[in-house]
């Protein structure tokens, strides 16, 4: 089968396209003939970890965690799926290929009306945003949340979920041309990362108070400034929480991290429980149903061929996509 591999770690991760043996099907696994692969934020993070020697590439080298397609094989212990079922599946690695195996517990049937692109992009984004924002982050009506890199896949879903809580939402966009598209999902307070004085504008929009919650999808951009905008006792969610903000002063007065008073709560953008947890699985299923009904939007910015994986990753990092990027084998 055709697949995308990660190699060349000593000189930085290199994505290459080639052939690989078909994956082995364990008793609790589902074999999926892939229709569309989604490139998730967690995939980008893993490449960064490989680059810095903080993690090893997966056995066999095939990267990617999520894809939609059709069930082509089932393990002996699988009970919820049949051959031919349309599904989306999540696993630690192996999705960037024509065939993908994933545990039954982290595989979902596609709700009627859900297109394969939105399906491929759904599980991780839905689980990570919901858990970070609503479960661990406890965002409430009347609070103010600032979303950095708001046009990312995670940023766009965070906008929608935050608005549903009744919170005030401010977004920082790298591409000012996206304003009209952001307004269509309900965001009205939009700051330009390149044209606006973000600190001054946020303080203006909050009458000098600052924000209760920062949801930072960037790779550490503006961390020091954004932490200063969080009120004491507020929350800061990011991918590299410990490294990027543990030592940052926070609050309008620039309190030291060990200062007396309410601490800044630091949250990783992730699910507290694994994707195969029954509660996570159920929540993702409900939210996918909402996407199928048009109640939530999960935009797909561009589709690449699987053999163009290197270009697809580069597009995400430098092309300012609005939402997800997917690949077709």
Go through the PLM ranges and name each one.
Residues 11, 20-68:
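N-terminal glycine-rich beta->alpha transition that marks the start or flank
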Residues 289, 293-299, 310-329:
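C-terminal capping/lid region of NAD(P)-dependent oxidoreductase domains
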Residues 47, 68-91:
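A glycine-/small-residue-rich N-terminal strand-loop-strand element
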Residues 86-149:
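NAD(P)H dinucleotide-binding glycine-rich loop of Rossmann-like/cofactor-binding domains
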Residues 221-295, 329:
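Glycine-rich phosphate-binding loop and adjacent beta-alpha segment
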Residues 126-195:
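Mid-domain Rossmann-like dinucleotide-binding core that forms the NAD(H)/NADP(H) cofactor-binding site
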Residues 197-208:
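Short amphipathic alpha-helix with an adjacent loop that forms part of the alpha/beta core around
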């Amino acid at each position: 089968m055709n697949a995308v591999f990660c190699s060349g770690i000593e000189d930085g991760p290199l994505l290459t396209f080639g052939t690989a043996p078909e994956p082995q099907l364990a008793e609790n696994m589902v074999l999926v003939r892939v229709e569309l692969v989604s490139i998730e934020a967690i995939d980008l993070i893993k490449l960064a970890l490989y680059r810095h020697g903080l993690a090893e590439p997966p056995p066999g080298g095939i990267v990617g965690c999520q894809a939609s397609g059709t069930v082509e094989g089932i393990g002996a212990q699988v009970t919820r799926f049949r051959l031919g079922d349309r599904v989306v599946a999540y696993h630690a690695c192996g999705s960037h290929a024509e065939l993908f195996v994933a545990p039954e517990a982290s595989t979902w049937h596609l709700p009627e009306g859900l297109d394969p692109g939105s399906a491929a992009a759904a599980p991780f984004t839905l689980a990570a945003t919901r858990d970070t924002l609503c479960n661990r982050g406890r965002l409430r009506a009347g609070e103010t949340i600032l979303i950095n890199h708001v046009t990312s896949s995670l940023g766009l879903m965070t906008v929608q979920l935050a608005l549903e809580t009744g919170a005030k939402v401010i977004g920082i966009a790298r591409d000012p041309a996206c304003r009209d598209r952001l307004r269509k999902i309900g965001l009205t307070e939009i700051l330009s990362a390149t044209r606006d004085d973000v600190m001054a504008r946020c303080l203006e929009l909050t009458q000098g108070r600052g924000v209760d919650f920062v949801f930072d999808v960037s790779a550490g951009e503006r961390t020091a400034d954004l932490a200063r905008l969080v009120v004491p006792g507020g929350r800061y969610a990011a991918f590299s929480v410990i490294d990027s903000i543990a030592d940052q002063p926070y609050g309008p007065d620039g309190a030291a991290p060990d200062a007396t008073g309410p601490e800044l709560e630091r949250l990783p953008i992730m699910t507290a429980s694994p994707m195969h947890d029954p509660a996570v699985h159920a929540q993702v299923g409900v939210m996918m149903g909402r996407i199928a009904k048009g109640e939530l939007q999960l935009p797909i910015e561009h589709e690449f061929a699987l053999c163009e994986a290197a270009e697809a990753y580069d597009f995400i990092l430098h092309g300012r996509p609005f939402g997800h990027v997917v690949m077709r084998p």
